[in-house]
Amino acid sequence: MIVGHGIDLQEISAIEKVYQRNPRFAQKILTEQELAIFESFPYKRRLSYLAGRWAGKEAFAKAIGTGIGRLTFQDIEILNDVRGCPILTKSPFKGNSFISISHSGNYVQASVILEDKK
């Protein structure tokens, strides 16, 4: 049974402005594994990756119903499976989780669905 659904839309240019003012912003948002992937990319790809992880983590927080206020970005990790699809590899939710991240122009959209294991 679906117990939560969250969606987030993020402008990549807004993330770029924050990142340019404070490059440590990425360390606040990304886990150690996500940060290693982020650092392997050229600048433009870094921005879309960071915006995608931001949107995915915001969507997760909305789906679980707490918002980021009760979670930290470090509580949630989004990596890719062998096909390149994003997956939630770390979160406080114990059921099944499904994530989709889509990029289009200056925008990134993420959707998270949480399903009870029952």
From Swiss-Prot:
One Pfam family named in its UniProt record: ACPS
Highest taxon of the lineage: Bacteria
Essential cofactor(s): Mg(2+)
Keyword Cytoplasm on entry: yes
EC number(s) given by UniProt: 2.7.8.7
Keyword annotations of the record: Cytoplasm, Fatty acid biosynthesis, Fatty acid metabolism, Lipid biosynthesis, Lipid metabolism, Magnesium, Metal-binding, Transferase
Stretches assigned to coiled coil: none
Subcellular localization(s) per the UniProt record: Cytoplasm
Predominant place of localization: cytoplasm
Reactions it catalyzes: apo-[ACP] + CoA = holo-[ACP] + adenosine 3',5'-bisphosphate + H(+)
GO molecular function, one term: holo-[acyl-carrier-protein] synthase activity
Gene Ontology biological-process annotations: fatty acid biosynthetic process
Binding site for Mg(2+): D8, E58
Gene Ontology CC: one annotated term: cytoplasm
HAMAP family: AcpS
Family recorded in the similarity comment: Belongs to the P-Pant transferase superfamily. AcpS family.
Reported function: Transfers the 4'-phosphopantetheine moiety from coenzyme A to a Ser of acyl-carrier-protein.
Protein name: Holo-[acyl-carrier-protein] synthase
Organism in which the protein naturally occurs: Streptococcus pyogenes serotype M28 (strain MGAS6180)
Gene transcribed to yield this protein: acpS
